[in-house]
């Protein structure tokens, strides 16, 4: 909210997961129970509308699959040395999906707000990744 107050041209893009109601609710104002199903991406998405989400300042939501979130989280660690949580991989993948909306002169800030320490047994575990069919 503060950033938009300082510069109304700032765009805030939220990343959502399949199985969450945020994107559809943001676009239509409808809380659709049919959008809700289990997902493994922790830290994003909801099957409720929390009071701490101010939908009025979010310009759009982009959906990212659980598999893409997990793979991009691991890629952050491997390629960039960033030991991040699963929602961080989702944020990077979501940005890549939205890159067509960007101009060369745009400045992009991605918030990576979670450490990978809570995901050692999941995202950073090959057996878990294989059990979810995220790795072969």
Predicted features, each with a name:
Residues 1, 87-95:
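Short glycine/serine/threonine-rich phosphate/pyrophosphate-binding segments
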Residues 4-86, 123-136:
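Active-site/ligand-binding loops adjacent to catalytic centers
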Residues 38, 93-136:
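Phosphate-binding loop/pocket of nucleotide- and phosphate-handling active sites
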């Amino acid at each position: 909210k503060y950033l938009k107050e300082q510069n109304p041209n700032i765009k805030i893009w939220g990343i959502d997961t399949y199985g969450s109601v945020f994107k559809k609710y943001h676009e239509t104002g409808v809380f659709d129970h049919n959008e809700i199903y289990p997902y493994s991406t922790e830290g994003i998405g909801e099957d409720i509308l929390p009071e701490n989400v101010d939908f009025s300042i979010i310009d759009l939501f982009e959906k990212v699959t659980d598999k893409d979130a997990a793979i991009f989280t691991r890629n952050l660690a491997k390629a960039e040395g960033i030991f991040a949580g699963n929602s961080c991989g989702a944020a990077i993948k979501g940005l890549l999906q939205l890159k067509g909306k960007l101009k060369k002169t745009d400045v992009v800030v991605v918030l990576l707000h979670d450490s990978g320490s809570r995901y050692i047994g999941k995202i950073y575990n090959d057996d878990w990744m294989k059990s979810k069919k995220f790795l072969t």
